[in-house]
A protein has these predicted regions:
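Accessory interaction regions appended to the cores of large information-processing enzymes
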Residues: 1-175
């Protein structure tokens, strides 16, 4: 799908189960658009504990290759220790790259410089299994990017609207 068609589209995705589960929010943008400026702003404005990175892969830092479309990853929670930081930027970083590349391989989005992907990522501080975390990040990102690009199934949207008075959330215990 061309960058012009996806600018400003959002989605979320979840992969796996706690504590190694990964939750992401995704924003797709077109280079040069107002939404693209938001992605660039997120990338160029780090703060203590929150370091935006450009998704890159390779066996070592000297051989990094940028994932296309360019993908900015921002952590939603500050790393609590070196282990958590390695999981966020290593295992999740590889999973994000794989998930984006899965959606490119399916033909859903283009691997170009005009499409931009912003991934806001959450990982439980108790996570510990890097292989599982990587797989869960891949699942979450692939689902979110695909949903952002093509939208939700109309029947699923209608189901939510019909159930609007009884929808639940795991962090809400009320009626």
């Amino acid at each position: 799908m061309a960058a012009e068609d996806i600018d400003g589209r959002f989605a979320q995705g979840w992969g796996g189960a706690a504590p190694n589960g990964v939750h992401v929010n995704v924003l797709l943008a077109r280079r040069g658009s107002a939404t693209g400026a938001v992605v660039a702003g997120a990338f160029t404005n780090p703060s203590a504990g929150f370091t935006p990175v450009l998704a890159s892969v390779g066996p070592d830092q000297q051989s990094y290759e940028t994932v296309h479309p360019p993908t900015v990853v921002v952590n939603k929670i500050a790393p609590v220790d070196e282990r958590h930081e390695k999981l966020i930027f290593g295992a999740c970083g590889a999973g994000v790259a794989r998930g984006v590349l899965d959606v490119v391989a399916s033909g859903t989005i283009d691997a170009d410089q005009d499409t931009l992907v912003l991934v806001s990522l959450w990982l439980d501080t108790a996570a510990e299994d890097e292989t599982t975390v990587c797989a869960n990040a891949r699942t979450a990102v692939a689902a979110a990017v695909a949903e952002a690009a093509v939208g939700r199934d109309r029947a699923a949207v209608e189901r939510l609207v019909a159930a609007r008075d009884t929808v639940r959330h795991p962090f809400y215990d009320g009626a």
